[in-house]
C-alpha cells in the first residue's frame, strides 16, 4: 500500500491574499483554483516539484477566523526545505517576506523563521547534507 499526504489546509482571510503571498512572494505554483460555490473555492499552491500542497481555505466562520495565523498555537507549523538557503532567503527578503530572526546554523542545517501575512510561522531550512 502506498500513501502520501496530498494537501494540508491553511486558513486564510481571503483567497486573493493567500494566492498573492504564496504565489507572488514565495514563488509557489498555483496548482488549482476551482470555484465550488459562490463563496468557496478549491485553491492549491505548492513549491515547484513538491509532492504535497497547501489547500488555501478562506475562513467562513468565527472559529475559523479566530484560528487564522494560530493554527499551531504559536509554534512553527510549516517547514520549507531548500537546496540553497542563501538564494531563497535573499529572494524572499526582496519580495517582502518578514523573517523573525537572522539565519542560524543548527546540527540539522541552516534555518530561519519567517511568517506569512496572516501570522503563520514557517522555517526556511537547507538541510545539512
Feature-to-residue mapping (PLM):
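Sequence-level detector for tyrosine residue identity
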Residues: 15, 22, 105-108
Amino acid at each position: 500500500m502506498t500513501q502520501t499526504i496530498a494537501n494540508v489546509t491553511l486558513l486564510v482571510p481571503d483567497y486573493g491574499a493567500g494566492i498573492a503571498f504564496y504565489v507572488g512572494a514565495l514563488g509557489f505554483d498555483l496548482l488549482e483554483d476551482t470555484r465550488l460555490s459562490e463563496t468557496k473555492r478549491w485553491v492549491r499552491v505548492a513549491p515547484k516539484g513538491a509532492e504535497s500542497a497547501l489547500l488555501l481555505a478562506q475562513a467562513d466562520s468565527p472559529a475559523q477566523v479566530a484560528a487564522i495565523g494560530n493554527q499551531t498555537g504559536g509554534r512553527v507549523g510549516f517547514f520549507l526545505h531548500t537546496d540553497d538557503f542563501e538564494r531563497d532567503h535573499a529572494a524572499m527578503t526582496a519580495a517582502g517576506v518578514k523573517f523573525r530572526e537572522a539565519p542560524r546554523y543548527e546540527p540539522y542545517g541552516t534555518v530561519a523563521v519567517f511568517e506569512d501575512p496572516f501570522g503563520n510561522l514557517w522555517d526556511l531550512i537547507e538541510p545539512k547534507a
